[in-house]
């Protein structure tokens, strides 16, 4: 009877390990998809804003600002998914690389909040006021913060690939 109990306990422990590995695989996939989607959306915002400003066409600038405003809700779902899966994958890790990723993500979050406010302001300013010096200064701030966020996210993606062994240090 003791053998049967031990055997059942071993089977249960094996099943728990399998489920844990499966959960981790799902977390990794969701984290990867959220990373790719976030980088694509943010880089699209950055590039279209830059092209619109360099072109100087007020109609195109307004169009870009409207579309950015429409797509911000996508980031409202993607960025928390990225943070939650990243934190679950990191668990209580003390790895310097994981700690760097977590520090970078805090800055991405802070910059992201400022970028959302700037996007709303730039939409409002481009549609209900002239595209003037105030607009251009806010646009410059948005481009700088957007570039910083892209850089931080690319550095985090590289660190993630190194941690997974898919990229050599």
Predicted regions and their residues:
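Short, Lys/Arg-rich, polar N-terminal cytosolic tail immediately upstream
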Residues: 11-25
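Polytopic transmembrane helical bundles with strong interfacial aromatic enrichment
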Residues: 22-169
């Amino acid at each position: 009877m003791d053998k049967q109990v031990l055997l059942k306990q071993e089977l249960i422990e094996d099943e728990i390990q399998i489920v844990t590995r499966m959960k981790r695989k799902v977390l990794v996939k969701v984290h990867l998809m959220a990373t790719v989607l976030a980088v694509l959306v943010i880089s699209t915002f950055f590039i279209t804003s830059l092209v619109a400003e360099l072109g100087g066409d007020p109609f195109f600038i307004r169009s870009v600002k409207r579309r950015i405003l429409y797509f911000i809700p996508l980031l409202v779902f993607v960025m928390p998914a990225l943070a939650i899966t990243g934190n679950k994958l990191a668990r209580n890790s003390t790895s310097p690389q994981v700690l760097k990723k977590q520090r970078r993500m805090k800055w991405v979050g802070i910059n992201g909040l400022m970028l959302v406010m700037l996007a709303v302001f730039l939409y409002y300013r481009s549609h209900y006021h002239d595209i003037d010096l105030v607009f251009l200064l806010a646009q410059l701030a948005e481009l700088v913060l957007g570039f910083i966020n892209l850089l931080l996210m690319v550095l985090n993606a590289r660190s993630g690939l190194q941690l997974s062994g898919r990229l050599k240090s």
